[in-house]
């Protein structure tokens, strides 16, 4: 991931690492440096997204940034819940691999036919949103779709693409492909941010907000919500686009997005499945110890149950046979009635 995005140390520490030690930090540093060097050699130093700040951030746009953060939080919730539901659907088809492949292929091909922007990782479409200004640019976003040539339907197209991208990703992952979650969260965030800004400006809900800037902030907001990683969202988006002058609005959007998603989901998309299975290791030492502990290894099974009407002589015999300090008293149905503490006899 460092090879592609050139900013993955923060992601590793914030999302993947449960505990940090020098022994675990050194391999991470070495792998990040190596991957980044090869990336510069093979692809150059150009940013993944082409962004130029032409409209600096202003203080009167704070309310819009807060609302965008809340909106990104709900988009992140939709992303996570829909992905989880689709994974469950495809998991039921595990015994029928060809049926699963057929379902995934039909869903994905149908969505790409209707919305060509869904093809691939979609970075080219996001780049158009980041630097587009004219109707010709918006037509490029809708190129080869049924919406092409109808720039007045741009908002509808952007909204539908945002809505359906999750299904395209889920169909890819579920049918055996590699759709990932990192790149789709960037794509959905960019389109969601542009959709929010365009609706805001059309209905004049407040001061004018630059759509390109909010496309960028939407990427950070959705990534933060999906991964529960605000530092990753802030630094990664700033690094990918060179938009360091938008640090304050990026912070506002990421914080609001995280606060919103945390109300509904306490774990990131990477930790959600482990948490549901009870296998998630956390920074809480006691919880981590309980997670790693095998209950079968601590449950005592070597005991000799006795009946409540057992004569005293036989009870003494049972006590001599027992390797524990207690004898469970059970009835004929095997229901526990009490415990005899040998140390108190």
Spans of model-derived segments:
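Hydrophobic core segments of alpha-helical transmembrane domains in multi-pass membrane transport
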Residues: 31-38, 65-74, 101-114, 162-169, ...
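Re-entrant/interfacial helical elements at transmembrane boundaries that shape
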Residues: 8-15, 49-50, 123-128, 173-193, ...
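Membrane-interfacial segments at transmembrane helix termini in multi-pass membrane proteins
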Residues: 213-214, 220-227, 231-305
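Short beta->alpha transition motifs characteristic of CBS
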Residues: 336-345
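Juxtamembrane interface elements at the cytosolic ends of transmembrane helices
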Residues: 6-10, 46-47, 70-90, 119-123
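The conserved cystathionine-beta-synthase
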Residues: 306-323, 329-330
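Helix-loop-helix hairpins and the membrane-proximal interhelical loops
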Residues: 85-210
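Short, small-residue-biased leader/transition segments that mark boundaries at the very start
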Residues: 1-5
